[in-house]
Amino acid sequence: MLEIKNLSVSVDGIDIINNLNLKITKGKKVAIMGPNGSGKSTLSNIIAGKEGYRINQGEIIFNDQNILELDPEERAASGIYLAFQYPVEIPGIANSSFLRTALNSIRKYNGQDPLDTRAFLDECKLVSEKLGLDKSFLSCLLYTSPSPRDVEE
């Protein structure tokens, strides 16, 4: 669960987020929408732990812990990642590499062994079946150069 309590944030003395309260329960899907400059990116960056923001007040509770007390690396290890909507395409690097690295970081933090490529792909298949995702979605995950952004949106 993610809960934001009375969060106020500023950048360079300019208030960006004022007294935000939000509760997202496990399994719930939420879209944060708003016009340019309304604080969507600021909120994402604050949750991920990006520097340059002043937290004037409030808490961000993730899995019963105030993550504002954690380094970005500790937040990532707890399962919080910030990924681009349109990731930079690097020839030869698939989205699956990013996802496997992220998962293995969490596994390491939890004292588990990392998954090799085969085990990771098997896990992806199990999860996609559990979620009822089309097999073409998983196939697109493995592409290295064709634009995967169409699937990620």
Predicted segment positions?
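Conserved hydrophobic segment flanking the Walker A/P-loop of ABC-type ATPase nucleotide-binding domains
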Residues: 24-26
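The feature captures the beta-strand-to-loop junction immediately N-terminal to the Walker
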Residues: 33-35
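Helix-to-loop junction immediately C-terminal to a conserved catalytic motif
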Residues: 48
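ABC ATPase NBD Q-loop/coupling interface
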Residues: 59-75
